[in-house]
Every structure is written in C-alpha cells, then in structure tokens.
From Swiss-Prot:
Source organism per UniProt: Thioalkalivibrio sulfidiphilus (strain HL-EbGR7)
UniProt GO MF annotations: protoheme IX farnesyltransferase activity
Miscellaneous note of the record: Carbon 2 of the heme B porphyrin ring is defined according to the Fischer nomenclature.
Listed PROSITE patterns: UBIA
Span of the signal peptide: none
Cellular compartments annotated: Cell inner membrane
Catalysed conversion reaction: heme b + (2E,6E)-farnesyl diphosphate + H2O = Fe(II)-heme o + diphosphate
Pathways per UniProt: Porphyrin-containing compound metabolism; heme O biosynthesis; heme O from protoheme: step 1/1
Enzyme Commission identifier(s): 2.5.1.141
Family: Belongs to the UbiA prenyltransferase family. Protoheme IX farnesyltransferase subfamily.
NCBIfam families (UniProt xref): cyoE_ctaB (TIGR01473), PRK04375.1-2 (NF003349)
Protein name: Protoheme IX farnesyltransferase
Amino acid sequence: MAIADLTLSKSHAGSWRRYYELGKPKVVALILFTALVGMLLSVPGMVPWHTMLFGLLGIGLAAASGAALNHVIDRRIDAVMDRTRNRPLPTGQLETQKALVFAIAMGVVAMGILVLAVNVLTAVLTFFALIGYAVIYTVFLKRTTPQNIVWGGLAGALPPLLGWVAVTGQITVEPLLLVLLIFVWTPPHFWALAIRRREDYARAGIPMLPVTHGVAFTKLQVLLYTLMLLTVSLVPFIIHMTGLIYLVGALALGIGFVFHAYRLWRSPDDRYAMPTFGYSIFYLTAMFALLLVDHYVRMMMA
C-alpha cells in the first residue's frame, strides 16, 4: 500500500511538472520582470500592493496561457526539432486536449483577474498580446515569412506597457519606448539562436531567416539591428525619462551587444551564435534593472 501511494505521488508530481513546463516558466519570468519594471517606473512613489499582485498574476497567467497554446499548436513541429522534441506533447507525456483545456483556463482566469482587480485597458492589451503571440505569430507568421519574429515580436514586447497601464490606466510615451526597446531587441536575440538551430528549423519547414536567406545575411541583420538597438536605447535619456546612470549603463551594455554581433558577423562559422544569444538575454535583463536603479536614485536625489 505504501509503495502504491508513493508511486501515485510521484505520478502526480510528474504530471504537474509537465503542466509547469507548458507555461515556459523562464520566459514568463522575464515577461513578469519587464512588466514589474513598467509598474515601478510609472509612479514616483510606491505601487499599490494589490495592483502589483493582481496585475502580475494576471499578466503571468496570460503569458503562461500563450506559451501553453504555443505548445499545442506547434506540437508536430516540436516533434521533429532536436531542441523541442522532448517537450510534454511530442513525447506523449501529456494529452493535447488536456493541455488545450489548461491553456484556455489560464487565459480565462487571467482576463477575469485583470478586468475585476486591475482595469479593463490592461485586460484588453493583455488579450491582444495573447492573441498576437498564440495565434497571429504561432499560427500564421511563424509558418509563412522569414520576418516572422520581427512582426510577431510586438506581442512579446508589450509587458512593460501592460505593467505601466495596470498602475496608471493610461498609455503614454514612456512605456511605448520600453516596448520599442524590446521590439528592436527581439530579432537579433532570436536570429542568433536561429543561426545555430537553422537545420532544426529547415527540417520543420519553418522559414526562419537563416533558412531562407542564409547565415551570412542573417549575421548582417543581427549586427544592423543591434546598432539600431543601441540608438533606440539612448532615447529615454534624450527625452529626460532617465538620467546619467542609465545613459552610462545603456552605452556600456549596448557596446557589449554590438561587440558580440560584430564578432558573430566576422566569424566564418556559427561559433559565436550562442554567446550572442546568451548575451542578448543578459542585456535585456540588465537594461531593465538599470532603468529601476536610475529611477530610484533620481528619486532619492530629488
């Protein structure tokens, strides 16, 4: 009896881990961090705890819902790609119908929380972000154009705006700049990974840029977008949204990103693709942390 109970307990634990994996927790964590920064930058003082709690809960559940829907829609593609073939749906560890119900349930709960406990505008924007990622990007753009990640990246760039609007109820230029920062960051981030995984994408029939236009062209695009990102990152300082701490940090981080992109471009192979991809994650996290540090230092000095 004890052995049977232990086996059942392990089975339940494994099942919950598979549902947890459906939500892409690492991606959701970065989304929540950028949304939190949007919240904290939106006001000079403290954000009301209930707005922060329910705002992040709703945004996080919506992001996890979109991730789970992505698992469901891409299950056949995932099965032929080395990077994704061990996910719960391709391996049969989780039934597609259960995953779909789980994804929809999270989305419904997320919308309910945002409408009832935050504000309608945040709920509407979050809904559009969810549909933009799970439907427009995953179903259409990803499968039809090498510019998929450019236009599809807008949905993934919205979390700072969602956080800002959750607190203020308004759309202003400052959160739109944060959206622009992530929007321009997205192509070099994903294309660096796509260079390394191009054979995977080709096997799955996904028209990622390295598959359709070649590695050399993609490397050049990574460099050009990184230079564009460096320029965009200076705009918050130019419009007096940030101070000198941000300016110095943004320049240092941006030059570091350009260095990685330039090294990738000059390399005769793809050896620097994953280091560039890794730095891109560090860059975005550090940039948003830098925005917070600059914000609170300027508040203390005011």
